[in-house]
Amino acid sequence: MNRWMSVVRQSPNGVDAWRAARLSRLKARRKLWLEVHGWLGLILGFCLAIFGITGSVLVFYEETDDWLNPGVIALANLVEGQEHFRPVDDIVEAARSVMPDRAQIGSIIYPRHDRRAYQFFYRVVTDNESTPELRHVFVNPYTAEVTGTRAVIERGRWLPDGFVPFMFQLHFALLAGNTGAVVVGIMGVISIISVLTGLIVWWPLTGKWRRALTIKRAASPERLNHDVHQTFGFYTALIMLAVLLSGVYMNLPDHFKVPVKLLSPNSRSFTDNPQSSPAAGRSPIGLDRALASVRRSYPEGRVNWLRLPEGETGVYTISIRDVPGLSRFWSERRVTVDQYSGEILTVHDPDTRTAAGDTFLDWMWPLHSGKAVQKAAPARGLGGGEESNYRPK
């Protein structure tokens, strides 16, 4: 067979016939991929448009939330400076005063400027409900008074309170809770396949690269539409793949981490399990002392969010962002603190990564939010960890 092919290729007519047969096979295969790509586009196109529009709006979610909630989130400028803030433990006590008994505080978003309220995310779980309620509480940092509350997920209600929570729920779950988040994650996987099939269809089989990389001027509307789709699809393919891959990670983190763990088992994301050491006669030190302990060791950057210990062996977690000297793509440092001794247990930042899996997972949020390219074009987005606060668990 190989000898016959060699003879065919040595003959000019044989070469032409072989090339024609090969091109015919490639075109038939391309037609199949075109069908797959077209159907995937029809099925997912509308939802992808929703994800794109809501994601663009959420780039400015903080400014939007401030503007729409004066007096609740954006406060009157009565006093300047964090030195006038009430102790964080007082803030926590004020927030707890309006929460039900079974509330579980998730994250506490520290004011990003002097005129913004603390924002608490908490869940209420009942014995007979698979999906918990998710609510926000806002507290004035100067007076430790609750300025407002709102429901993100509430039993008996389809829509959340407020424009920003609505955008978040629509963006990652299509307003369908945990089930919607899984469905959107699966859509992300299928969309990745759609992008890859699009690249297969785009590939110029006859070597006409200029036609594949440019838009023909003065073309018919049909040809213009084809060229725009084909050309912009190629030039944005890497961006689309990065956004889709990171989106799958955020919606399906447990499934996403399985191959990462197989390829990089020593990643701290899988091995770190900091725990406090309870002892008789010792009580938790409180969030103020935990925060002070972290700031003594790491004074640079600004406090981003805080988390309280869960259970007797739980730890305080404190996030500091915009830390000078760290990676320009990921300038956050997360520190865990023993709730009884105040000892710093772990530090997670770009300087402490131990394996490729850590870097890969840490890159997911900068890629999705656009922070990875902010040096070239300033981009905005949620701080690390905060995006999960708008979803049920």
Where are these predicted regions, by residue range?
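Conserved histidines in hydrophobic membrane contexts and catalytic metal-binding motifs
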Residues: 2-393
